[in-house]
């Protein structure tokens, strides 16, 4: 796909005014971006415990969207300082690790090895070359410590300093004048390297990508295409895809999910971990092994389970704690994302199902139709003690609840979709009845009738709005912002190009990375 194809959206976006695209700016690394970057820079292995750093509350599911609106608190600054000093000490306190990191053995602070290392490490850490004065500043740390410590200690503190700099802790993507004058700004060659690396790999750029930026390749159509292909071909691309789905589906929340132990004795931490791992393994299989259509995530029957999760799903013949491939029965009630225990358990209460939460997910995350929050004077009486009359299903109670004019407008958008999942309990296990009562899992979506989650999934698959919404979610993750009204032509072009290329997930990744919304900005924040 030629990178130059983005010119279509340049004209469309530009027609609406020079500020049609989102503005450029700087944003903090998310905790995951920080940890993956530090691990890559210092050569840390998976056994190294991640330091405590200030977390970010997601906006529309994505932490990198929220990170663009936040500054660091005093506590956050201290946490990053402590982390940098601790991790640098861990590496430089080990002769083997520090030798592997530095790549030469400095005899003194004045040894050329010192500056060479600081230039190379600094470029990767700050994702751009250091100016001579910046190298001087950090080399000065090594020199100043020479009378009281060896050169390795000086380098340790210099590295800790580089990792505390705003140039590392923030993604500084402020752009430069666009020579075509279609947009106010284009992202620079090094900023493009940064954007590509965090989008595809969820970490700091490698030397090959920074070298491509140094030669201007990340701004040239052929060079950009080559880097996109290289990044996607790497096994490291799985990290970026995994992070997208973990945030989009909130599967990190499974680690702290609680269920009523009396009602759901199978709700163990190991089962929750298997739910999370199923999502990661299944999406990786769809994206990288099967190169499946984007919509296959809705009705896919090929999954991965261990013994604990297989038991929950009613699958036989699976033993052990490791995930293994499994095929969900064609005649069964479960398939695709909306049949996973991760979705069904997360979007439920501790003691019962929640058609409202499940329907809200479908409405907002698959159809991109935001639901307004409850009014400020909302009183939560639905789950109050004594509020559940005997002999009524949850659906019957919610239908009665929707007769309240203050509740009906929003619940009507969510509950009818969520009723499709009532054959699955709050842990995601199938149930034939609800306490002996007949379950009604029929409904309609955009005027189309369905019975159960598989028919709902089929209706969603056939709905072009769902494909557009999935692309929009990827675009938000890639760019770190909620799309502006002026970016509608960009999103339309991304969808058209990806569908023409085959409609696979990677087709959307390529189209987004090659779009005007990823490469250009409408000014500064």
Residue map of PLM features:
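Active-site substrate-binding loop specific to GH73 endo-beta-N-acetylglucosaminidase modules
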Residues: 19, 29, 39-465, 471-476, ...
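GGW-centered surface loops in extracellular recognition modules
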Residues: 27, 34
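Ser/Thr-rich, Pro/Gly/Ala-heavy low-complexity intrinsically disordered linkers and tails
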Residues: 1-21, 25
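Axial heme c-ligation environment in periplasmic c-type cytochrome domains
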Residues: 478-483
């Amino acid at each position: 796909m030629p990178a130059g194809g983005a010119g279509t959206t340049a004209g469309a976006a530009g027609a609406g005014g020079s500020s049609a695209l989102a503005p450029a700016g700087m944003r903090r690394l998310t905790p995951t971006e920080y940890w993956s970057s530090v691990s890559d820079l210092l050569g840390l292995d998976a056994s190294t415990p991640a330091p405590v750093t200030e977390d970010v509350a997601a906006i529309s599911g994505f932490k990198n969207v929220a990170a663009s609106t936040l500054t660091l608190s005093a506590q956050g600054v201290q946490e990053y300082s402590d982390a940098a000093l601790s991790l640098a000490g861990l590496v430089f306190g080990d002769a083997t690790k520090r030798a592997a990191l530095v790549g030469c053995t400095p005899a003194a602070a004045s040894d050329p090895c010192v500056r060479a290392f600081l230039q190379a490490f600094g470029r990767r850490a700050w994702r751009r070359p250091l100016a001579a004065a910046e190298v001087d500043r950090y080399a000065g740390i090594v020199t100043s410590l020479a009378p009281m410590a060896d050169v390795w200690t000086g380098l340790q503190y210099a590295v800790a300093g580089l990792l505390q700099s705003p140039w590392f802790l923030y993604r500084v993507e402020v752009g430069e004048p666009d020579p075509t004058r279609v947009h106010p700004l284009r992202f620079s060659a090094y900023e493009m390297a940064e954007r590509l690396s965090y989008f595809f790999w969820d970490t700091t750029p490698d030397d090959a990508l920074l070298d491509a930026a140094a030669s201007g390749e990340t701004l040239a159509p052929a060079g950009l295409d080559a880097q996109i292909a290289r990044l996607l071909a790497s096994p490291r691309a799985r990290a970026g895809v995994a992070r997208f789905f973990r945030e989009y589906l909130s599967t990190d929340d499974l680690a702290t999910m609680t269920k009523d132990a009396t009602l759901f004795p199978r709700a163990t931490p190991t089962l929750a971990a298997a739910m999370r791992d199923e999502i990661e393994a299944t999406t990786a299989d769809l994206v990288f092994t099967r190169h499946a259509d984007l919509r296959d995530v809705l009705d896919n029957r090929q999954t991965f389970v261990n013994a604990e999760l297989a038991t929950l799903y009613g699958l036989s013949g699976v033993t052990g704690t490791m995930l293994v491939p499994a095929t969900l029965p064609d005649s069964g009630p479960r398939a695709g994302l909306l049949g996973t225990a991760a979705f069904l358990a997360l979007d439920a209460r501790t003691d019962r199902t929640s058609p409202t939460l499940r329907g809200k997910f479908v409405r907002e995350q698959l159809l991109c139709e935001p639901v307004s929050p409850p009014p400020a004077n909302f009183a939560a009486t639905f789950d109050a003690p004594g509020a559940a009359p005997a002999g009524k299903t949850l659906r019957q109670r919610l239908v009665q609840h929707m007769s309240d004019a203050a509740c009906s407008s929003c619940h009507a958008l969510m509950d009818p979709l969520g009723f499709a999942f009532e054959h699955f309990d709050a842990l995601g296990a199938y149930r034939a009845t609800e306490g002996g009562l007949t379950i009604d899992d029929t409904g309609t979506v955009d005027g189309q009738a369905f019975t159960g989650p598989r028919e709902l999934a089929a209706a969603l698959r056939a709905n072009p709005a769902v494909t557009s919404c999935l692309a929009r979610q990827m675009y938000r993750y890639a760019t770190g912002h909620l799309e502006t009204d002026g970016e509608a032509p960009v999103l339309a072009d991304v969808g058209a190009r990806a569908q023409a290329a085959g409609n696979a997930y990677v087709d959307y990744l390529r189209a987004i990375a090659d779009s005007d919304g990823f490469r250009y900005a409408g000014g500064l924040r």
